[in-house]
Amino acid sequence: MKKLVLLSAFVLLAFQVQADSIQNTDEEIKTEEQPGEENQAVSISFGDPEGYALQDAAIRRARRCPPCPSCLSCPWCPRCLRCPMCKCNPK
C-alpha cells in the first residue's frame, strides 16, 4: 500500500514539473512576440480614390454594347447614350 502511495505521489510530482516547464516556455514565447514601438503603427494602402476612378473608366471603355440593329456603323448601342453621332440615339 505504501508503494502505491509513493508511486502515485511520484507520478503527480512528475506531471506538475512537466506542467510548470510548459507554462514557463509559454510565458517566454509571449514576451518574445510583443512588438516594439517602431512596429506598432503600420498602414498599408493599395490605391487611392483616383485609382478607383481610373479603373472604373477602363472597365467602361472595355465594355461596349453590341451595334444597334438600325445603325450598324455605330459601335455603341443607342441605349448607352454615348454616341452623339448615331442617328438612332434617342435624346
UniProtKB/Swiss-Prot annotation:
Single biological process term from Gene Ontology: defense response to bacterium
Gene Ontology CC annotations of this record: extracellular space
SMART domains for the chain: Defensin_propep
Signal peptide boundaries: 1-19
Keywords attached to this entry: Antimicrobial, Defensin, Repeat, Secreted, Signal
Compartments (UniProt record): Secreted
Membrane-crossing segments per the record: none
Region (6 X 3 AA tandem repeats of C-P-X): 65-88
Function noted in UniProt: Apparent precursor of a secreted, cationic, proline- and cysteine-rich peptide that contains Cys-Pro-Xaa repeats. Unlike cryptdin, the proposed mature peptide region lacks the structural motif characteristic of defensins. It may have microbicidal activities.
Name by which UniProt lists this protein: Alpha-defensin-related sequence 12
Organism from which the protein derives: Mus musculus (Mouse)
Name of encoding gene: Defa-rs12
